[in-house]
A protein has these predicted regions:
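Small-residue-biased structural context
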Residues: 1-184
Length: 184
């Protein structure tokens, strides 16, 4: 179960919407990893591979996923909100709902982090904790499934359609800078 956070993305920062989509694939991957570890180990001792997979997934959600949320909430969504067109109002209401979902996900990730650290430190989880861990992972998978669908099928295409190329380029620079990188 070796997992690498740094797998080569399909997009570069010159395609910021593609970069956001790549992040969604990583979120799905690492939630699947947590679900797999939870199902295999059932709160018991973790094999070396399970431990490494758990640590990698937790690290991704602690660092990478928070940057992704900032990419959307600080880079993409404000640009969409700055466009004053009546035909975009319904979509912007969806953007508001997405931000609410991000807050819900943040709370879920915090609890998963706490339980995952506990599991790694103690070597096992009590029944109530392992049940809660599995529930949280399932809840986050459901939450992200809906969130990602709205973003990829509605919000991202709208962004490409309404944002000028210069704004998309600026987004790419901001996303790269958030990761301490020069834009490719």
């Amino acid at each position: 179960m070796p997992i690498a956070i740094g797998a080569k993305p399909k997009s570069t920062f010159t395609d910021p919407i593609g970069s956001l989509t790549d992040c969604h694939r990583r979120i799905e991957l690492f939630l699947a990893v947590l679900a797999q570890v939870s199902a295999q180990a059932r709160g018991g001792p973790l094999s070396r591979e399970e431990r490494e997979a758990m640590e990698t997934a937790l690290r991704y959600f602690r660092a990478g996923a928070t940057k992704h949320t900032a990419d959307e909430e600080e880079t993409l969504f404000p640009r969409l909100r700055s466009i004053e067109r009546p035909d975009l109002r319904a979509m912007l209401e969806k953007v508001d709902a997405l931000e609410d979902q991000h807050e819900e996900a943040k709370r879920g990730h915090a609890e998963i982090e706490q339980l995952g650290r506990k599991w790694l430190a103690a070597g096992s989880l009590a029944l109530v904790d392992r049940t809660r861990f599995a529930e949280l992972v399932a809840q986050l998978r459901d939450l992200y499934r809906g969130n990602i669908a709205v973003e990829e099928q509605q919000v991202f295409p709208m962004a490409v359609a309404v944002l000028p190329r210069s704004e998309l380029e600026a987004m790419g620079r901001e996303i790269a800078a958030r990761r301490g990188l020069q834009r490719e």
